[in-house]
Amino acid sequence: MNSALQGIKVIDFSQWLPGQYCGMVLADFGADVIKVEGVKGDPNRNFAPQLAPGMSSWNLALNRNKKGITVNIKTEEGQEILKKLLRRADVFLEGFRPGYLQSKGLGYEEVVKINPRLIYCSITGFGQESKYKQQPAHDLNIIGLSGMNFLNDTGNVAISEVQVSAIGSSLNAVAAISMALLAREKTGKGQYIDVSLYNTALSMQIVSLASISGCRITGDTPFGRRAHYYDVYKTKDGKYISVGTIEPKFWRMFCEMIELPELKNRQYDFVHEEEITQMIRDELLTKTRDEWISLAENGAFCVTPVYNPEEALENDMTKESGMLETRREDLGEVTYLKPAVKLSDTPCNIRFRGPYAGEHNRKVLGALGYSDEEIVSFKEKGII
């Protein structure tokens, strides 16, 4: 099978979701990815659920298609191992706090001297130049700092189960790496990529913040707040439906469906919004979710069910999407969620599960020229 990134060598030295998801996408589309961890393995190896000792579902999914090695870069020997890998690599992916790898002789300025064609991508909370660059932060912190928590409601803070800034940063990194690889074809040189979760969270709010036009609209755009025509409503059985009737024609169809034709011409009546919203709430409580969806012609005018994760995975829309792939692994039957994009000639390909920590130490280090005796010695000394 042809792969879009076949022949591209990636060293993934990230510990958390933003870098690992980026490396996963690159690997799924054919890149040869080596996952580097500390000698104790990444922290997520201990997350629940555990499929086997040292193998969490997180690791199995995010590190699929990657070879795994462990290296202690606090030692000179470990630093030299990583440098040997980087001499042969096309892409280096890391997520340490700014300055840490520089302190180990592995910063961009040092590494580019041994491999000018290397694309060096850093994914951090606040970027390399921010005065907050040393501040630790996870997705929950980032979406709070960026104002994203408040966008879906009027006063109540919303917490998403989806790591929005982390996944967004991953995809930004994939795009940036792809552009840098294309640019390298013209210039012959690699470059440095600085990806920030905070900047990603801000950029994802372009419609809601509307700051590029000079008018700071916070909460008054159709997508930046709840309106009676753009909201989630509870139904008789305690379930919910999404009403996304932004287009006037869809709004009119919705009003007919709920038998409130008097609201057809009041789509933008925000003066009486609370009253209109309550009318809709009362009416939607008279039927179950599935009864309303049947009347809504299964989404014909942007009225759709709100599913829980189990329902989302089991519904026909997901099954026919091609997003799920079930494979028989040594740990048992595993269902993987594939990348969202589909390439007609060079599709993604899930080839093997995520590795145990250091599973490919001997194979990878042997390819670098280290003897079996040296590899055993490295293990005994805590270098790998």
Residue ranges of model-derived segments:
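Flexible, small-/acidic-enriched active-site or ligand-binding loops
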Residues: 270, 328-377
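Active-site-adjacent "lid/gating" segments in soluble enzymes
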Residues: 22-25, 29, 88, 102-241, ...
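Conserved small-residue-rich beta-alpha loop and adjacent elements
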Residues: 2-41
